[in-house]
C-alpha cells in the first residue's frame, strides 16, 4: 500500500472504548456528572497512586501480573513514564534488560547518560536509552546528516521490518550525492560531524539490537492515553468503572469470575444478584457493584430482560 503512495491506517476495535463509554454513563446516572475523557488531568496524583498500589485490574494494558509488578517497581509519576513503559514492556526489551535499565535510570539508581552530550535533547526524556523508533531517526539526522526522508526510508523502515542486512549490503544513492551503504553513510556522516568512530559504532550496534523491539512513540502515546483515562476512572469512580468492565464481559464466565475476584481484592464489594434489585447488566451502587442478571451462567440477556419486565409489571 505504501509503495503505491497511499496512506495506510490501522483501525483498532478496542473493548476499552466501550468500557469508558459505559463507565461515563454509569457516572452520569449516579452523580449527574458528564465526564469528558479529553479533559481528564494526566497529572492527577490519584492515577499514579492507583498504579503504584497494584490495583490495576480492568485498567487498559497494565493489568497483567507482570505489568503490575513492573509498574509497582517503576513508580511512574508522569504520563511520559507510562508511554515508555508501553513501548518497553514486550519480549525484546524485557529480554535485553531495557526495562530494568530504564527504571533504574529513572529512579536515580543508574546514571542517566547519553552517548554524547549533543544527543541529550533526543535521549533526555528516556534517560539516555533508545526507546522509540523516532529517536533513532532523530539521531541519524543530528549525528549523521541524514535528511528526514532518508531517516524514515533508510533507517526506520528497515529497522521496523527487521531487514538488517539491507543496512550493510545495499549501496544506495544519497541526497548529498554519495553512493554507499546505510552503514557507511552513518559512519562517514558521524565522523564528518565530529563524533568519534567509537560513539558512532556503539550507537549503530545498539540500533541493530534495538531493531528486535523497535516501537514508535505515537503508538505508545495513543495507548498510554487510554491507560491514563481508565486509571483515572477507576481511581475516582471504582464502582461505576468496574461495573462497566464486568458488563463488557457478559456471557464470558471465566472473565466475570476473574474480575469479581479482582474487585474484592481491590476492596470493591460485589453484591449478589437479586431479582428485586439487579438489572440486566452489572450496576454501580453506593455499596458496590450489583451483579447483573445476564451475568449469571445459563440466564442470558433474554431471560434477564423477561425477569425485569415481570418485576416492573407486577412489582417485587
Residue ranges and their predicted role:
Residues 1-316:
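Noncatalytic, beta-rich nucleic-acid-contacting surfaces in large DNA/RNA-processing enzymes
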Amino acid at each position: 500500500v505504501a509503495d503505491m503512495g497511499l496512506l495506510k491506517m490501522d483501525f483498532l476495535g478496542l473493548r476499552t472504548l466501550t468500557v469508558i463509554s459505559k463507565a461515563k454513563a454509569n457516572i452520569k446516572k449516579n452523580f449527574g456528572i458528564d465526564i469528558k475523557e479529553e479533559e481528564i488531568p494526566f497529572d492527577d496524583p490519584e492515577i499514579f497512586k492507583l498504579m503504584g498500589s497494584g490495583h490495576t485490574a480492568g485498567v487498559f494494558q497494565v493489568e497483567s501480573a507482570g505489568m503490575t509488578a513492573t509498574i509497582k517497581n517503576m513508580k511512574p509519576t508522569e504520563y511520559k513514564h507510562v508511554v515508555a513503559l508501553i513501548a518497553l514492556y514486550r519480549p525484546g526489551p524485557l529480554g535485553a534488560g531495557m526495562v530494568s535499565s530504564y527504571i533504574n535510570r529513572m529512579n536515580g539508581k543508574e546514571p542517566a547518560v547519553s552517548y554524547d552530550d549533543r544527543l541529550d535533547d533526543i535521549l533526555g526524556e528516556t534517560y539516555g536509552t533508545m526507546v522509540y523508533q523516532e529517536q533513532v531517526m532523530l539521531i541519524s539526522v543530528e549525528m549523521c546528516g541524514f535528511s528526514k526522508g532518508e531517516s524514515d526510508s533508510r533507517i526506520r523502515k528497515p529497522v521496523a521490518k527487521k531487514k538488517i542486512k539491507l543496512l550493510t549490503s545495499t549501496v544506495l544513492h544519497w541526497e548529498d550525492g554519495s553512493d554507499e551503504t546505510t552503514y557507511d553513510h552513518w559512519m562517514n556522516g558521524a565522523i564528518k560531524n565530529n563524533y568519534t568512530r567509537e560513539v558512532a559504532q556503539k550507537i549503530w550496534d545498539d540500533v541493530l539490537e534495538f531493531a528486535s523491539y523497535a516501537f514508535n512513540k505515537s503508538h505508545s502515546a495513543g495507548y498510554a492515553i487510554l491507560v491514563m483515562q481508565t486509571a483515572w476512572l477507576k481511581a475516582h469512580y471504582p464502582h461505576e468503572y468496574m461495573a462497566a468492565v464486568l458488563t463488557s464481559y457478559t456471557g464470558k464466565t471465566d472473565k466475570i469470575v476473574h474480575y469479581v475476584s479482582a474487585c474484592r481484592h481491590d476492596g470493591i464489594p460485589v453484591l449478589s444478584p437479586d431479582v428485586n434489585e439487579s438489572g440486566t447488566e452489572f450496576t454501580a451502587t453506593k455499596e458496590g457493584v450489583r451483579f447483573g442478571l445476564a451475568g449469571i451462567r445459563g440466564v442470558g440477556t433474554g431471560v434477564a430482560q423477561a425477569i425485569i419486565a415481570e418485576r416492573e409489571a407486577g412489582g417485587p
